[in-house]
Amino acid sequence: MSVGRIRYDWHKAEIRAVYDTPLLELIYQAASVHRQFHNPKQIQVCKLISIKTGACPEDCSYCAQSSRYQTEVKPQALLDKQTVVEIAQNAKQKGVSRVCMGAAWREVRDNSQFDRVLEMVKDVTDMGLEVCCTLGMLTSEQAKKLETAGLYAYNHNLDTSSDYYSTIITTRTYGDRLNTIENVRQTNVTVCSGGILGLGESIDDRVAMLQTLATLNPHPESVPINILSQVEGTPLEDQPDVPVWDVVRMIATARIVMPTSDVRLSAGRARLSQVEQAFCFMAGANSIFSSDDNKMLTVTTPCPDYDADQEMLNLLGLEMRPPSQRPQPVVMGNS
């Protein structure tokens, strides 16, 4: 099987064969693809701002923000615009090129809160930063409003395969997620979509999720690979840790089947050592979340701080990527 070609007709068996490639050979192939399509010295550093925290009505089994579980998360109302702008300004000074605004909503509603989010998007975009939002389900009209406000990307993760999905979430369907992604794809806003490792899924579930993403034309602009952090009070609090080599395999496979996408080493990164993260970067990860306040990610896991990340990047000979230093996705035929 040749690698390094952009294609949208991946079969599960092909992706499984990539995933099962002997580890060092897999890393080598993924690194080769990465160097073909990306600057291997650059890492995009992102900042997540939880603009509305907790009290989510959904039952995602991994999430501490669900109102159905007894966790330590304290609900927080929608932040005011000035607070968000100040956080974004500080992040930009640290070298961050993308700000992701997350709200614990099931879906976006056409009300004053959405209007406030649109203002946040516009103001932070005007600072020269890429802005990504993750707000739940989205209609086509709402996607167009976000596009008009200047939104660069919309995050809506698949989480896992369509077959395993109902084991983890029952309050929205897999089809609901795909519909939101399609609504975004009808605009010039790019798609950010990935999944979570450690939910109890099989390797075939991981492969199936990647196939769903890799058969989108164009591929998602970015693909977050999250590692489950077992949050006390959630149904998945006793799940075993994901082996780091599973994370590396998933990153490498995503890099090979979606060569132009950013592969984001996302939630759960704080548990990885610098050596383990270096293997992830070798395998094709080229984006991370960083913070100066140890605030939680959307799955409520601590995020490494800017200083530690800058030290690591310096050690590895890597640098922070400026905003929008990558081409916009284009629709192509299979080659």
From Swiss-Prot:
Biological process, per Gene Ontology: biotin biosynthetic process
Pathway the protein takes part in: Cofactor biosynthesis; biotin biosynthesis; biotin from 7,8-diaminononanoate: step 2/2
EC number: 2.8.1.6
GO molecular function, one term: biotin synthase activity
Positions that bind [2Fe-2S] cluster: C100, C132, C192, R264
Function of the molecule: Catalyzes the conversion of dethiobiotin (DTB) to biotin by the insertion of a sulfur atom into dethiobiotin via a radical-based mechanism.
PANTHER family reported for this sequence: BIOTIN SYNTHASE, BIOTIN SYNTHASE, MITOCHONDRIAL
Protein name: Biotin synthase
Recorded name of the encoding gene: bioB
